[in-house]
């Protein structure tokens, strides 16, 4: 979105040191929000919005994904396209979900190693992003229990459409798709930021764990980002960030929501 608006500065550096505009006022309708999520950020989709119908874009996305799955990039990356499409469809239809390899394997009737192998291939081919849990020790950070996002939110809305699901009718799916959309705006910009941080999510263990959707880490400094699809923000929406702020490395935390104004919850929230 910032590239389309002609902003060359990375949002990642602004999250670290930028001064928020506390006088900001603005609003976005649910229809416009869903439209932006559906279009995503890839230039071939976003830049052709006026020339391409929704159905044409859907066919183009499906064709692009099929082409990526049909390429053998490395000798050991042979894949069965039937298995690949089945696994990818399940992952894309649950944006922001934490990967449960055993559950997915049971649902699709494949073994765990097959699921893990295909998820690894999808990440290398830039179809999905797998965020590890920051709370896990570095030597235990595997694909299992990663948080899965499409590399572009248009992939998810297309998968949901194929599954007969509609963001307009499912607030939970809208929340997950918005989370992926926001993360799609931030993670690519880490590559041209001054900080170039590593990306994680953060989640406590236990029955009712606190969680933060995206954590950026660089030089023992943390930035936390939580995403909410609601138009009103509550103090408890900052609970995950508050818990994360107990980490000595914490610098700032942000809640991205769909309301019309900036709200300061605390000096660093």
Where are these regions (language model features)?
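Conserved AAA+ ATPase "SRH/arginine-finger" region at the nucleotide-binding site
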Residues: 1-2
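Interdomain hinge/linker elements that couple catalytic modules in large macromolecular machines
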Residues: 6-159, 163-164, 169-177, 181-184
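A cross-kingdom feature that marks ATP-driven nucleic-acid transaction machinery
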Residues: 120-121, 127-128, 132-269
């Amino acid at each position: 979105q910032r590239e389309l608006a002609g902003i060359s500065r990375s949002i990642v550096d602004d999250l670290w040191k930028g001064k928020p505009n506390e006088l900001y006022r603005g609003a976005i309708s649910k229809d416009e929000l869903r439209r932006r999520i559906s279009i995503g950020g890839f230039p071939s989709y976003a830049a052709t919005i006026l020339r391409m119908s929704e159905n044409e874009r859907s066919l183009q996305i499906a064709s692009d994904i099929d082409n990526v799955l049909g390429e053998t990039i490395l000798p050991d990356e042979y894949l069965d396209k039937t298995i690949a499409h089945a696994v990818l469809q399940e992952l894309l239809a649950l944006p922001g979900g934490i990967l449960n390899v055993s559950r997915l394997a049971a649902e699709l009737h494949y073994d765990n190693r097959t699921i893990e192998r295909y998820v690894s291939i999808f990440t290398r081919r830039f179809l999905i992003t797998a965020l590890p849990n920051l709370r896990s020790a570095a030597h235990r950070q595997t694909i299992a229990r990663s948080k899965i996002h499409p590399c572009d939110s248009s992939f998810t809305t297309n998968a949901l459409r194929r599954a007969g699901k509609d963001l307009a009718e499912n607030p939970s799916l809208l929340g997950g798709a918005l989370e992926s959309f926001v993360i799609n705006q931030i993670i690519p910009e880490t590559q041209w930021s001054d900080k170039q941080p590593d990306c994680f999510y953060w989640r406590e263990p236990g029955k009712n764990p606190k969680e933060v959707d995206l954590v950026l880490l660089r030089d023992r400094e943390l930035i936390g980002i939580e995403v909410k699809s609601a138009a009103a923000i509550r103090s408890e929406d900052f609970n995950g960030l508050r818990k994360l702020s107990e980490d000595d490395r914490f610098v700032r935390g942000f809640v991205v929501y769909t309301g019309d104004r900036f709200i300061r919850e605390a000096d660093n929230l």
